[in-house]
């Protein structure tokens, strides 16, 4: 089959080489955007008198026919035509004849593909933003149910200090809020039109770039044509933001995996988000959480791959840039699906509140409370720290906890200790008293929830 760019060439190409160079297997995802870009471009050509209005109307009608066929899955693409742009042009030629060749006036595939990617990513990021907003709602709703649910807080995966489970959930709410802000902020760099940059230097035709940008819903145009066709920062920024978002999902999934284990039993995932074993009938595995954790590395790989492709490219277009799409498509799909599954897991999981709270009774996470108690009695904190540390060692040797120590023994250690120490050492009191701004105290959690709801 004759190539649309074949005038310069005499030799015939070979099918296996065509297959290697073709991108239609994946860039056909942008068929809708390619048709939209072409409709805007031909409208601009007609408006500016670059082609006759009658021909612009004929091309427009042909493109709309292709849009209808695309919607019904009736368009067939070929690797012979390499990419989505040449496939669309070939199909348009079959619909309306040689006038289709005028569509590419004042346009290059360089600005055409960049336009497609801006359009595609803009819509896809908008959908991810909506899913992220939904996840934040789910977290707030779950947190509201567990303001007074007590759990161990960890450092080094060792019991550190007791927390409200709501406080833990709201920590992730803060992370996902920053993810949301990053994605929303990045839209202004996606929402720029490269259309009209042509190959790299602009065009001699009297085009109106602002008009085509307006038709496509872009808020601005690239000020430099060379930058317009060369820029892939907007994709790297999306991949970077996605990597951070997936990292947050992965950290929470790691905790869910631990919490569902027999050793923890803090939560139970519903059957929909779990799988069994082919040999061990008792197993209920947190596969969806594990997959999100695993797919985080995949998203990181897409970011590093894109950075590596771009690091040595001179301006402007190079065929290497064909490698900018698959990682973007894969990341979009991975992030979208991961968000939806994760929100479902959190929304439907059962929280074993009694087991969580019991876990804080069988540890020394109240040791800081005893040290603070002594400090408030006038004992220098470092001295209090030393006293409590020795007492913890004594307790571990005797197989008891701080709340099991007799008052008489406490008073031998320091006569300032009174009977109220047992109230102080309760995990609920420990949580309730941490009412510094942003702390885990119940009053602070309620304030945090109200503030969070204002941002939903």
From Swiss-Prot:
<dbReference type="GO" id="GO:0042450">
    <property type="term" value="P:arginine biosynthetic process via ornithine"/>
</dbReference>
<dbReference type="InterPro" id="IPR029419">
    <property type="entry name" value="Arg_succ_lyase_C"/>
</dbReference>
<keyword id="KW-0456">Lyase</keyword>
<dbReference type="InterPro" id="IPR024083">
    <property type="entry name" value="Fumarase/histidase_N"/>
</dbReference>
<comment type="similarity">
    <text>Belongs to the lyase 1 family. Argininosuccinate lyase subfamily.</text>
</comment>
<dbReference type="GO" id="GO:0005829">
    <property type="term" value="C:cytosol"/>
</dbReference>
<dbReference type="Pfam" id="PF14698">
    <property type="entry name" value="ASL_C2"/>
</dbReference>
<dbReference type="InterPro" id="IPR022761">
    <property type="entry name" value="Fumarate_lyase_N"/>
</dbReference>
<protein>
    <recommendedName>
        <fullName>Argininosuccinate lyase</fullName>
        <ecNumber>4.3.2.1</ecNumber>
    </recommendedName>
</protein>
<dbReference type="Pfam" id="PF00206">
    <property type="entry name" value="Lyase_1"/>
</dbReference>
<dbReference type="GO" id="GO:0004056">
    <property type="term" value="F:argininosuccinate lyase activity"/>
</dbReference>
<keyword id="KW-0055">Arginine biosynthesis</keyword>
<keyword id="KW-0963">Cytoplasm</keyword>
<keyword id="KW-0028">Amino-acid biosynthesis</keyword>
<comment type="pathway">
    <text>Amino-acid biosynthesis; L-arginine biosynthesis; L-arginine from L-ornithine and carbamoyl phosphate: step 3/3.</text>
</comment>
<dbReference type="InterPro" id="IPR000362">
    <property type="entry name" value="Fumarate_lyase_fam"/>
</dbReference>
<dbReference type="GO" id="GO:0006526">
    <property type="term" value="P:L-arginine biosynthetic process"/>
</dbReference>
<dbReference type="InterPro" id="IPR009049">
    <property type="entry name" value="Argininosuccinate_lyase"/>
</dbReference>
<dbReference type="InterPro" id="IPR020557">
    <property type="entry name" value="Fumarate_lyase_CS"/>
</dbReference>
<dbReference type="InterPro" id="IPR008948">
    <property type="entry name" value="L-Aspartase-like"/>
</dbReference>
């Amino acid at each position: 089959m004759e190539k649309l760019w074949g005038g310069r060439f005499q030799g015939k190409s070979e099918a296996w080489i065509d297959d290697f160079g073709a991108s239609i297997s994946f860039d056909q995802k942008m068929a809708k955007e390619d048709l939209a870009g072409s409709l805007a471009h031909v409208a601009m050509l007609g408006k500016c008198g670059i082609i006759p209005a009658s021909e612009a109307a004929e091309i427009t009608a042909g493109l709309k026919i292709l849009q209808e066929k695309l919607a019904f899955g009736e368009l067939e693409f070929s690797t012979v035509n390499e990419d989505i742009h040449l496939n669309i042009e070939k199909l348009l030629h079959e619909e309306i004849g040689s006038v289709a060749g005028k569509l590419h006036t004042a346009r290059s595939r360089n600005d055409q593909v960049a336009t497609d990617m801006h359009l595609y990513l803009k819509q896809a990021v908008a959908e991810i933003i909506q899913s992220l907003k939904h996840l934040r709602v789910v977290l707030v709703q779950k947190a509201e149910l567990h303001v007074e649910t007590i759990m161990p807080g960890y450092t080094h995966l060792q019991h550190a200090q007791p927390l409200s489970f709501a406080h833990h959930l709201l920590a992730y709410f803060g992370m996902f809020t920053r993810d949301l802000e990053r994605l929303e902020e990045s839209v202004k760099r996606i929402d720029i039109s490269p259309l009209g940059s042509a190959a790299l230097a602009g065009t001699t035709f009297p085009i109106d770039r602002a008009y085509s940008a307006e038709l496509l819903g872009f808020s601005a145009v690239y000020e430099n044509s060379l930058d317009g066709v060369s820029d892939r920062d907007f994709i790297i920024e999306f991949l970077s933001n996605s990597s951070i978002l997936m990292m947050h999902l992965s950290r929470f999934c790691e905790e869910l995996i631990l919490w569902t284990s027999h050793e923890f039993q803090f939560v139970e995932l519903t059957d929909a988000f779990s799988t069994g074993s082919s040999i061990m009938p008792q197993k209920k595995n947190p596969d969806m959480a594990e997959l999100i954790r695993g797919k985080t590395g995949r998203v990181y790989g897409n970011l590093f791959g894109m950075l590596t492709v771009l690091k040595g490219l001179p301006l402007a277009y190079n065929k290497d840039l064909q490698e900018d799409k698959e990682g973007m498509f894969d990341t979009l799909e991975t992030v979208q699906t991961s968000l939806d599954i994760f929100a479902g897991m959190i929304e439907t999981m059962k929280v074993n509140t009694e087991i969580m709270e019991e876990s804080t009774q069988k540890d020394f996470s109240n040791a800081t409370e005893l040290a603070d108690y002594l400090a408030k009695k006038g004992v220098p904190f470092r001295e209090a720290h030393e006293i409590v540390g020795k007492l913890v060692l004594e307790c571990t040797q005797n197989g008891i906890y701080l709340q099991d120590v007799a008052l008489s023994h406490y008073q031998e250690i320091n006569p300032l200790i009174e009977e109220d120490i047992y109230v102080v050492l309760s995990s609920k009191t420990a949580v309730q008293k941490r009412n510094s701004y942003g702390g885990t105290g119940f009053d602070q959690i309620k304030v945090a929830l109200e503030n969070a709801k204002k941002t939903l």
